[in-house]
């Protein structure tokens, strides 16, 4: 069955000529001239564009205001005027009309001491200028103290960026001087701030004094790339004048208006209600193991009253930056264990996407001046009992976090029927009392909110506050701002994939083990793979082409392409002594006897990490070697085939994504072994590694040098039945050396015999592998 993935890999670079023609046609563009109109600030729609939410939960907001057209105006106090001239000569001048006149000129590189003619204050004057640098441009600040006085040179700024700046503050003019990238600001003259106008001959920007560090960065390093690479349309300084109106609690204000568009300011009270969702997955076997307890996005719809009007609202709650915990009560099948459970703490964030049916959200496409004020809320965890087949139930209880507002941006919510342009409120977390614990275990005193019962049986959490935004909307209230259709198409596909993933994961309980082993040994081709899916037989050819194109970009396909380098680098990275003891999952109990040579514990942990890296590469090594033995890819492909046949939601559009995801996500916890006569070497993705005798299953020192040689020269086998399971099987039932060798080599016939004989240990192991086939 693993031939399925081999087929996909070997054919993933085949593309139909029709696809090539379509792609070439899609790349053709047409140049269109657009009149930007009055909303041309920085050449974009009237919104402060930034890259928004980053993967590290950092919100970045641009602060550069401009560019503005050359003009004469009264420069606001405590604002840097950042000037960006494009040619030499007079750059700007200013005066308080009584006793201070100042002017700035730009001189190109390599100019010897010479006199040049400038028009300053309406008069033609001769000024002595020079620039000794062959690479830097030079700004020179001249000042005179009387109407008929003489200009004198006060300061210079040498720069490669052709940027200078000054600011009025506390009756003084501040100016950048020196040589970039070490230029700094200082003041040079005292003026009357109220009556000092500035005339600028170049485009300029305004930066508040609070962003002085940012202004210094621009002076020394240049403007951001977007200011240099886009066609920016400067606007008049008059567009900066905003009418100050007293905002009511809930009102709509027309900020500006043209024949087709208007800017509306919406002020709204808001009541946010949200809930957390979780996923609790129990492992296969005897019923004592849980594989995952995790947070999931949660949609919640509700109504509330705002100024006598009933509002229908929709929220989506999601989390970012979760912390993974685990608990392992022992190695026996009847020992309570949780492979992974998620907890949100100080390093986590909660996102709440909010939409309601009011006018404010009808055209929420082009938005600026977005702000919000919200209160804090405490989320407390409840009790969750782990129902064991026998014995008292362990109970996870406690845990609490406080959500505090940390920003707001635009977002899109995905519902079952429509996409909603909404507001995303971002909350940072602080842990609160009480801590959480699991009764009847040693796990206690941990702070944060676990995913087991995050809602504490309450109907919802509630946050109150208000928001304000300015939105560009059509002047005719009956029109709606257009949105690209492609967004909705991809969004519908994501919804279908989400439903399909949930169905796939729930089908694991319906797979018969004996039939699965038979299916895993069949060399099915691509046509047979999808023969059981309704409405796809006629489209198998085009569908498989789409699958191959999707598979071409998968992690597995990329990893296979550089198999040789990844294997040699990973194997040679194990800088350990000649002999070390095996390390199992319960390392802390055996650490004192783990290293035969007496090296420190840090070395052991380092070796475990390196072994984990090697184990990930061993899958690639096995993947490229065709054998008659069963592999993890055989089982995952068989599970995939079974679920495809049973699925009621599979379609031609979703199959490529499902196939690609299955190759990467099915059976994440794998182990591989190589054989050396009567000794087996076994390593796991989790960093565990063993060396043991085949006949007795007694552990022996792990010879790293021999292991490195074996993984290069010998076949790599999937440890379908891993060392712990084999040892448990031998201790409880006893197996012959022949059976041991066949199980070590993952012989499908022997595996099927044990399953048909209802051996609980082997069945539990295979059921665990099936449970790991999740998307």
Swiss-Prot record:
Region called Spike foot, residue ranges: 509-775
Site (Cleavage): 230-231, 240-241, 246-247
Residue span of motif DGE motif: 307-309
Disulphide-bridged cysteine pairs: 317-379
Alphabetically ordered keywords of this record: Capsid protein, Coiled coil, Disulfide bond, Hemagglutinin, Host cell membrane, Host cytoplasm, Host cytoskeleton, Host endoplasmic reticulum, Host membrane, Host-virus interaction, Membrane, Outer capsid protein, Viral attachment to host cell, Viral penetration into host cytoplasm, Viral penetration via permeabilization of host membrane, Virion, Virus entry into host cell
Coiled coil: 483-510
Motif (YGL motif): 447-449
Note: In group A rotaviruses, VP4 defines the P serotype. Some rotavirus strains are neuraminidase-sensitive and require sialic acid to attach to the cell surface. Some rotavirus strains are integrin-dependent. Some rotavirus strains depend on ganglioside for their entry into the host cell. Hsp70 also seems to be involved in the entry of some strains.
UniProt name for this protein: Outer capsid protein VP4
Upper lineage: Viruses, Riboviria, Orthornavirae, Duplornaviricota, Resentoviricetes
């Amino acid at each position: 069955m693993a031939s399925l993935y081999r087929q996909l890999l070997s054919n993933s670079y085949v593309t139909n000529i029709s696809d090539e023609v379509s792609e070439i046609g899609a790349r053709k563009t047409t140049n269109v001239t657009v009149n930007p109109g009055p909303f041309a600030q920085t050449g974009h729609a009237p919104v402060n564009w930034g890259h928004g939410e980053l993967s590290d939960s950092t919100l970045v907001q641009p602060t550069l205001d401009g560019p503005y057209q050359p003009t004469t105006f009264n420069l606001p106090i405590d604002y840097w005027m950042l000037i960006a001239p494009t040619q030499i000569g007079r750059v700007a001048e200013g005066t308080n009309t009584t006793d201070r006149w100042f002017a700035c000129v730009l001189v190109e590189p390599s100019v010897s001491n010479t006199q040049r003619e400038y028009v300053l204050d309406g008069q033609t004057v001769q000024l002595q200028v020079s620039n000794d640098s062959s690479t830097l441009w030079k700004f020179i600040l001249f000042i005179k103290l009387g109407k008929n006085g003489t200009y004198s040179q006060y300061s210079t700024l040498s720069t490669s960026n052709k940027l200078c700046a000054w600011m009025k503050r506390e009756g003084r003019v501040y100016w950048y001087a020196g040589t970039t990238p070490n230029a700094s600001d200082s003041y040079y003259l005292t003026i009357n701030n109220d009556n000092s106008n500035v005339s600028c001959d170049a485009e300029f920007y305004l930066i508040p004094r609070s962003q002085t560090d940012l202004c210094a960065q621009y002076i020394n390093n240049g403007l951001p790339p977007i200011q240099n690479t886009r066609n920016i349309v400067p606007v008049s300084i008059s567009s900066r004048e905003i009418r100050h109106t007293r905002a009511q609690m809930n009102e709509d204000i027309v900020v500006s208006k043209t024949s087709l568009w208007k800017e509306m300011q919406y002020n709204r009270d808001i009541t946010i209600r949200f809930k957390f969702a979780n996923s609790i997955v129990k492992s296969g076997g005897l019923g004592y193991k849980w594989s995952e307890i995790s947070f999931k996005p949660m949609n919640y719809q509700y109504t509330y009253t705002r100024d006598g009007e009933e509002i229908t609202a929709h929220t989506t709650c999601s989390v970012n930056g979760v912390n993974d915990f685990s608990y392992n009560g022992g190695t026996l099948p009847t020992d309570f264990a949780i492979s992974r459970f998620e907890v949100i703490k100080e390093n986590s964030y909660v996102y709440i996407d909010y939409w309601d049916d009011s006018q404010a959200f009808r055209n929420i496409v082009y938005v600026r001046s977005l702000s919000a004020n919200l209160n804090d809320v405490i989320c407390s965890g409840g009790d969750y009992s782990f129902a064991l087949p026998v014995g008292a139930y362990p109970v996870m209880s406690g845990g609490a976090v406080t959500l505090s507002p940390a920003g707001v941006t635009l977002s899109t919510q995905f519902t079952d029927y429509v996409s909603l342009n909404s507001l995303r409120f971002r909350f940072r977390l602080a842990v609160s009392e009480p801590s959480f614990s699991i009764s009847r275990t040693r796990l206690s005193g941990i702070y944060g909110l676990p995913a087991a019962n995050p809602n504490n049986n309450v109907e919802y959490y509630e946050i109150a506050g208000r928001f304000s935004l300015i939105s560009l909307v059509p002047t005719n209230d009956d029109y709606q701002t257009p949105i690209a259709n492609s967004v909705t198409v991809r969004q519908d596909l994501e919804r279908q994939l989400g439903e399909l993933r949930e169905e796939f994961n729930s089908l694991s309980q319906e797979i018969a083990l004996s039939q699965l082993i038979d299916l895993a040994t069949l060399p099915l081709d691509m046509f047979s793979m999808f023969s059981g899916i309704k409405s796809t037989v006629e489209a198998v050819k085009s569908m498989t082409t789409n699958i191959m194109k999707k598979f071409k970009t998968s992690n597995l396909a990329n990893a296979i392409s550089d198999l040789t380098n990844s294997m040699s680098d990973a194997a040679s990275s194990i800088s350990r002594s000649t002999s070390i003891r095996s390390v199992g999952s319960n390392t802390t109990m055996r650490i004192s006897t783990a290293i035969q040579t007496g090296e420190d514990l840090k070395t052991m942990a380092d070796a475990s990490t390196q072994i984990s890296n090697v184990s990930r590469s061993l899958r690639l090594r096995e993947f490229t070697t065709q054998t008659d033995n069963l592999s993890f890819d055989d089982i995952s492909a068989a599970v995939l085939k079974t679920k495809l046949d049973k699925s009621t939601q599979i379609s031609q559009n979703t199959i490529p994504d499902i196939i690609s995801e299955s190759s990467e996500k099915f059976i994440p916890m794998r182990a591989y072994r190589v054989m050396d006569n009567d000794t087996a070497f076994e390593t796991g993705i989790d960093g565990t590694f063993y060396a043991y005798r085949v006949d007795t299953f007694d552990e022996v020192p792990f010879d790293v040098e021999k292991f490195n040689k074996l993984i290069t020269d010998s076949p790599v086998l999937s440890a379908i039945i891993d060392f712990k399971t084999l040892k448990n099987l031998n201790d409880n039932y006893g197996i012959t050396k022949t059976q041991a060798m066949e199980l070590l080599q993952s012989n499908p016939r022997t595996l099927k015999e044990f399953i048909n004989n209802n051996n609980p240990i082997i069945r539990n192991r295979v059921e665990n592998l099936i449970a790991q086939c999740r998307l």
